[in-house]
Design a protein with these regions (language model features):
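Hydrophobic core residues within well-ordered beta-strands of beta-rich domains
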Residues: 20, 75-77, 96, 116, ...
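Transmembrane beta-barrel strands of outer-membrane/channel proteins
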Residues: 2-6, 38-44, 96-104, 118, ...
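Extracytoplasmic gating/loop element in the C-terminal half of outer-membrane beta-barrel translocons
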Residues: 129-225
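Short loop/turn motifs that connect adjacent beta-strands in outer-membrane beta-barrel proteins
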Residues: 31-36, 87-96, 109-111, 126-132, ...
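Outer-membrane beta-barrel transmembrane domain signature
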Residues: 131, 216-247
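Residues on the lipid-exposed face of transmembrane beta-strands in outer-membrane beta-barrel proteins
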Residues: 22-28, 77-83, 118-122, 136-138, ...
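Gram-negative/organellar outer-membrane beta-barrel architecture
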Residues: 1-88, 92-97, 163-164, 170-175, ...
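Transmembrane beta-barrel strand/turn architecture of Gram-negative outer membrane proteins
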Residues: 18-30, 98-106, 112-144
């Protein structure tokens, strides 16, 4: 694979990333329901933050964020293992799945880290109209050989991954800026419980509904990323692993353009600096 893209997070933080790179992947079955994969990636990332944001005379973001600017090369190897015993990968009504992925950066290049993510879910259908599911995911990334975790290698959660919160709406935040720039986190754990319920609409309308509750946490920066230029702890960088939670209703519509999802959410637990939302519209793979 060869690719080039720009990841623009300036609506939620102070930076954007330009990336060019490539990689090779190999996947193979272990059993009827289990697969494994291996990969190698080589890429060049350039983190851009406007110079005016980092002017010492009028800085609007923290020094630790400004220090993330620059270009660097990442060379990593990784693998994944997945067991899937659901009766349908798109709209399951029974069964379970679990997956593990790890990436080791530092096989050459400029950065060194180990990133691990796990996920899983279980599904049980009481009837065609009532289907209960419980899913969860967790991740941790940490530098090695003296490296900290750069801002674009951290985890960001919210939006589709945590309903009730904006994209990058939870996690560590830099309050030096009026907006409160998202800084992500080295660790996260998120769970979701969902119950599909009948809508009592004719099937040809293509509408389904579900009640849900999402809950979890995200945070944990390196200590070096919480300091001022003088080396003191910056009180305007907030970072904790407190519980966040939300509940609401999702509507799935099989539209002529493809599956669409509408989420109506109410936040039940949050920090004052989190960014929340009550409605989200998105495309969906599920129906």
């Amino acid at each position: 694979d060869l690719y080039s893209y720009r990841y623009d997070l300036t609506d939620y933080s102070a930076y954007r990333t330009n990336t060019i790179g490539g990689g090779v992947r190999l996947g193979f079955p272990l059993t009827l329901n289990a697969r494994a994969s291996a990969r190698y990636t080589l890429r060049r990332d350039e983190v851009e933050i406007p110079a005016s944001f980092c002017d010492p005379n009028a800085a609007v973001v923290s020094i630790s964020l400004c220090q993330q600017r620059g270009a660097y090369t990442t060379s990593l190897v990784g693998y994944g293992v997945r067991l899937d015993r659901r009766n349908d990968p798109i709209n399951p009504t029974r069964g379970f799945y679990t997956a593990l992925n790890q990436d080791l950066a530092g096989v050459g290049g400029d950065v060194n880290y180990l990133k691990t993510e796990v996920e899983g879910g279980i599904y049980y259908g009481f009837s065609p109209s009532f289907i209960l599911s419980a899913t969860g995911s967790a991740g941790y990334v940490d530098g090695w050989n003296g490296d900290t975790v750069r801002i674009n290698e951290r985890f960001y959660k919210g939006g589709n991954s945590f309903r009730g919160f904006e994209t990058a709406g939870i996690g560590a935040r830099d309050l030096n800026s009026a907006r409160g720039d998202a800084l992500g986190g080295k660790a996260y754990a998120i769970g979701s419980v969902e119950l599909t319920v009948p809508t009592f609409l004719p099937e040809q309308y293509g509408v389904k509904a579900a009640l849900f509750s999402d809950f979890g946490t995200l945070g944990m920066l390196d200590d070096e990323d919480k300091l001022t230029v003088a080396g003191a702890v910056d009180p305007n960088i907030v970072d904790d692993l407190s519980l966040r939670a939300s509940a609401g209703v999702s509507i799935f519509w099989r539209s002529p353009m493809g599956p669409i999802r509408f989420d109506f959410s109410q936040v039940l637990a949050k920090e004052d600096y989190d960014k929340t939302e009550t409605f989200r519209f998105s495309t969906s793979t599920r129906f």
